[in-house]
Amino acid sequence: MINIGPPKKRRLRRKGNRFKKTRRVIPWRRLMIGALWGTMALASLGMVVAVACFAGQMLFASDYFKVERIQVENNRRIGREEILALSDICPGTNIFELDLERVSTRIEKNPWIASARVRRMFPDQLVIRVDERIPKAIVRLDFMYYLDASGHVFKRLEKGDRLDFPVISGVDRQALLEGNEATLSQIDKALRLLDRLDGRKIFAIDDVSELSLDDTTGITLYTCIGGVPVRMGHDDYNSKLNRLEKIFPQLKTRLGLIDYIDTNVTRRIIVKLDAGELRGKG
């Protein structure tokens, strides 16, 4: 049968959700301006670097900064010429070419130099300031060496070196090299005892020829006259020296007759003579 009625509306099938894509516009103008500024910045940086390099070359090549004078300060034992020789600074060297730390290290190779500092004074001068070591005592190891106030062993004694310092004996060389704490503590005590003797008027550092160190008995001093042992023990040195000074004027003329002096008895000084013991209150 033929349908002659009005045509049916055809349903349109809708394909899934479609979103209209927005076309992206590239900001060429902005990019071009950014690129231009970047190029200009790089060019400026390049010019700065070039100018700096040129200026650096001019500084190193200029005669204006060549070393003309070297001033040496605070040297007493070591002469100026010896310090200049150690520095190995060639005349006419550009002041900017010098490695000041390396120059200081070369100067410090001398055992008498504790430290050296080098600084520039523009345009053409250097200043070298040194701190020298001062012997406090002589320590007996495999050989005799100078010892400074900080306990640093710094120089083996040679012909012509001064010998008028107290000698510290009883130090184990290997233990000292290894930094043994007990050995370092002993040396420190000996140096502190020398400090207490320094400046005294009755029994002073000039009355002492040697300090013998021992783990068990502590420190024993030996007098310059007669080589009499003075037993000081491990501590309380100041009060012991005070007691000793009260009777030392009486003993000084008889040191050749004394076997030993012991300060380790509380509030007493024991003096052993050949004939027996003389007890002195202090």
Curated annotation (Swiss-Prot):
One of its GO terms (cellular component) is cell division site. The chain crosses the membrane at residues 31-51. Residues 52-282 are periplasmic. It comes from the Bacteria. Keywords: Cell cycle, Cell division, Cell inner membrane, Cell membrane, Membrane, Transmembrane, Transmembrane helix. Residues 65-133 form the POTRA domain. Residues 1-30 are cytoplasmic. Belongs to the FtsQ/DivIB family. FtsQ subfamily. This is Cell division protein FtsQ. It comes from Syntrophotalea carbinolica (strain DSM 2380 / NBRC 103641 / GraBd1).
